[in-house]
């Protein structure tokens, strides 16, 4: 991500800037595919595919950094505005089908729309507060890492708690994982060729974020395989009983 305007970049980075831009574009492709896939799966399975709090945090981030504190780069603006547009569809299907997943908690089920609204507003205030504290350029990066961590943990917890794979798929997992993974080479390019303004990328916290993302999101694919195998075994056992 452009923590400092590209106009301040050294000549050696400008020579490889197209590679960093390609990574950003691939990120947009991955996440756009994920959003479209989530909308389709939500309608097909009549559920939602991303845990409630991470979904609201991610949507709030896109509202803040696509509309309120937009990026300097024209390409980054386009990527995030496009992502926000598709994410509106994800939010709509989540609000529409979420009640079906909360029959065990009637109080939550009855007030889900207000819970979504309050959660988005709360996360927007958090993103804006961090921007006021660190400055928008640095805050958008750190808050994006925080969103990713919440998405990774929330996805694992949701899959474990539900015990079924409705609302998700290998394609949804891979598109999300790939969309975030391709930003790591971009960060490496910035650190290697534009180190003066990207020293923070060697900080323990940044390295921890990257490591925990790889562990958690990689684990999701394994857990999804296990849950699907369990579903198949359960279905086969039920069929044998009927015979």
Curated annotation (Swiss-Prot):
EC number per UniProt: 4.2.3.-
Top-rank taxon, per record: Eukaryota
GO molecular function term, any single one: lyase activity
Subcellular location(s) per record: Membrane
Use case: Diterpenoid pyrones display various biological activities and FDDP C shows anti-cancer and anti-HIV activities. FDDP C also shows inhibitory activity of 42-mer-amyloid beta aggregation that is involved in the pathogenesis of Alzheimer's disease.
InterPro entries found in the cross-reference section: PaxB-like
Functional summary from the UniProt entry: Terpene cyclase; part of the gene cluster that mediates the biosynthesis of diterpenoid pyrones. The first step of the pathway is the synthesis of the alpha-pyrone moiety by the polyketide synthase dpmpA via condensation of one acetyl-CoA starter unit with 3 malonyl-CoA units and 2 methylations. The alpha-pyrone is then combined with geranylgeranyl pyrophosphate (GGPP) formed by the GGPP synthase dpmpD through the action of the prenyltransferase dpmpC to yield a linear alpha-pyrone diterpenoid.
Protein name from the UniProt record: Terpene cyclase dpmpB
The species this protein was found in: Macrophomina phaseolina (strain MS6)
